[in-house]
Amino acid sequence: MAAATAPQGWQWGEPRALGRAVKLLQRLEEQCRDLRLFVGPPSLRDLLPRTAQLLREVAKARSDKTRGDPEGPGGAGDFLVIYLTNLEAKGRQVAELLPHRGKKDANQDVFPEGSRFRRQLAKLALIFSHMHAELSALFPEGKYCGHLYQITKGSANTFWRENCGVRCVLPWAEFQSLLCSCHPVEPGPIMQALRSTLDLTCSGHVSVFEFDIFTRLFQPWPTLLKNWQLLAVNHPGYMAFLTYDEVQTRLQAYRDKPGSYIFRPSCTRLGQWAIGYVSSNGSILQTIPLNKPLLQVLLKGQKDGIFLYPDGKNHNPDLTELCRAVLNQCIQVSQEQLQLYQAMNSTFELCKICTERDKDVRIEPCGHLLCSCCLAAWQHSDSQTCPFCRCEIKGREAVSICQAQERSMEVRTTAGDSGDNCHQEAAEWKLESVTPSAPPLPPEVPCPQRPQNKGWLTLAPFTLPRLRPPLPLPKMASVLWEVTSRPQVREGATESS
């Protein structure tokens, strides 16, 4: 698709375009009433009304001329032109596949499981799911925030903002040129494969939301495209645009071969992986490893005898080379910070939730630190927000705490990637400094003798006041006093009580 920009006078035609899109979704919803189409996730019967409602909210918010949404290149107007054009095209494809109500000669090939038409409908449902997620991320409750969207991985966020500014969407050709200046890719089939992986909505453009999902899936940043090439191009276990039900169907052929597995980007938790595998007793299971690099998960699964045969094949690719490049980010603690925490009878590296273990993981994108055990327990309680600030947890990063006196060249070469530019290798990562302020401290863990209290992590955290040095007292001019045995005779003296 060519680069789409908001045409002159688009602001007057935008309400009509949004109205047409809502009516299109309503017509498709009428065609999806057959119970044989009620499958998922994702399910068109659920997605169509939710997308229509979100578009109504967008239209309402955009009608308020006082909002002042960014309307420059790649802003709110450009995004809506691209989005609505793509929505109309995908809507027509869905309409051609779905049976029309009241017509007995309608297409019946869409109902049988495994048919070509059913597979096309499942892929379109995935695209509609991605489009709804993208619109929700850039227009939460209908209000545009694409210019403020924060990419989860720090280095990826820096790359986008330095090269794209406040734009939320770019034509593929322009984005390809920018990315290749940082991560070179040969033109041809590999570039086409990269485009199909990045462009989740199949619009011919790349949004900041799609780039966020891609960098979360194929982290870490220094080896981003190496990871993608090994996992999405060369690995036989990778499956693109596959749903939960289709994974179950595909693995049925390997039920007599425990250890067979395939993996796909999750359609319910974008930015995370879903792995389907055949267990030792022949049952088919699917799991979503929360906020962990797929490389580490597959290696551990191979070691444990769970992920052995990708798509039933005997050869399991070796991922150890890429895992060796995944180094812990080193958080540097200055002398000032050490003194600040000592004044609170604590230490910077101590986890402020359990007060037992040291911090070894950072929540992304908010950046709060805690120990991995507390984070695992917190997420096990089905909470996907930070226990400190309640921001959504989109990722995690292993870290180690380095005090100021421990600086050395060896530490400098094993630091993380948040401050380096895209041309540096992993061994050249720089230390990242931390703002000299104490994080908010949640309450301590209750004693284990009271298992009924399972909500200890949901209590609202309180913030300790930032400690400041004592204010200096003003200097007072010295006064010569006459020393006598009778203090009452001094001028200005008061009577003793």
Swiss-Prot record:
Region spans: Linker: 322-350
Pfam families on file: Cbl_N (PF02262), Cbl_N2 (PF02761), Cbl_N3 (PF02762), zf-C3HC4_3 (PF13920)
Post-translational modification: Phosphorylated on multiple tyrosine residues by SRC.
Keyword Lyase in record: no
Entry's EC annotation: 2.3.2.27
Chain residues that bind 4-O-phospho-L-tyrosine: R264
Gene Ontology terms describing biological process: cell surface receptor signaling pathway; negative regulation of epidermal growth factor receptor signaling pathway; negative regulation of MAPK cascade; negative regulation of neuron apoptotic process; protein catabolic process; protein stabilization; protein ubiquitination; response to glial cell derived neurotrophic factor
Domain Cbl-PTB as annotated: residue spans: 7-321
Residues annotated for Ca(2+) binding in this entry: D199, T201, E210
Keyword set includes Manganese: no
Modified residues (Phosphotyrosine): Y341
Region annotated 4H, chain positions: 7-145
SUPFAM superfamilies recorded: EF-hand, N-terminal domain of cbl (N-cbl), RING/U-box, SH2 domain
UniProt entry keywords in alphabetical sequence: Calcium, Metal-binding, Phosphoprotein, SH3-binding, Transferase, Ubl conjugation, Ubl conjugation pathway, Zinc, Zinc-finger
Annotated region (SH2-like), positions in chain: 219-321
InterPro entries linked to this entry: Adaptor_Cbl, Adaptor_Cbl_EF_hand-like, Adaptor_Cbl_N_dom_sf, Adaptor_Cbl_N_hlx, Adaptor_Cbl_SH2-like, Cbl_PTB, EF-hand-dom_pair, SH2_dom_sf
Zn finger limits (RING-type): 351-390
Swiss-Prot/TrEMBL domain comment: EF-hand-like and Sh2-like domains are required for N-terminal inhibition of E3 activity.
Function: Acts as an E3 ubiquitin-protein ligase, which accepts ubiquitin from specific E2 ubiquitin-conjugating enzymes, and then transfers it to substrates promoting their degradation by the proteasome. Functionally coupled with the E2 ubiquitin-protein ligases UB2D1, UB2D2 and UB2D3. Regulator of EGFR mediated signal transduction; upon EGF activation, ubiquitinates EGFR. Inhibits EGF stimulated MAPK1 activation. Promotes ubiquitination of SRC phosphorylated at 'Tyr-419', has the highest ubiquitin ligase activity among CBL family proteins.
Other notes: This protein has one functional calcium-binding site.
Record's protein name: E3 ubiquitin-protein ligase CBL-C
Organism: Rattus norvegicus
Gene that encodes it: Cblc
